[in-house]
């Protein structure tokens, strides 16, 4: 979070404690893989923990651009950010720049079926297949609305964004279709678990889909506040 804030829970999320962090820069995303947590944020900041989030160190970052999202897949961390920046690492401690096909801001990144997918401003969607995030191509996007989050489940990618936008791909992120949304509120995060996609956003809006993202319904939300992420 803000000012390098990192908090940790060891009781299944019942209570959290502050953790000492090596940065005062705002951190915007966190991922986990190979027994390593990696968090990314403004000014290209990347920090890592190899002891279940108890202690953190700065990782080597090749960029000063904001990094807004990170995911782990195929033994690789991939983070994305402003100006189309994409960075990758095999260990979480040292990252390298990857050639990006776009210069628009990338905000969210997901992984599934050996494919990385990143989404961002103006409906931008890019993907990397079979080479652990080393090479990226543009995907066909059906929207010009900003996209903020992307998730994979049951052989489908789902991305969400401005004005209730929901788009879906069933061919490893190559082509995408608009999906009817029950809201015009901005959707910021999306996650998958128990055969269900859940999206959340402004005004406490929560949506769910139980048919691989093909149709969506409003869920009962206990808050009018903005929701920025969904995890499972």
Each predicted region: which residue ranges?
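Residue-level hotspots at or immediately adjacent to binding/recognition sites across diverse folds
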Residues: 1-232
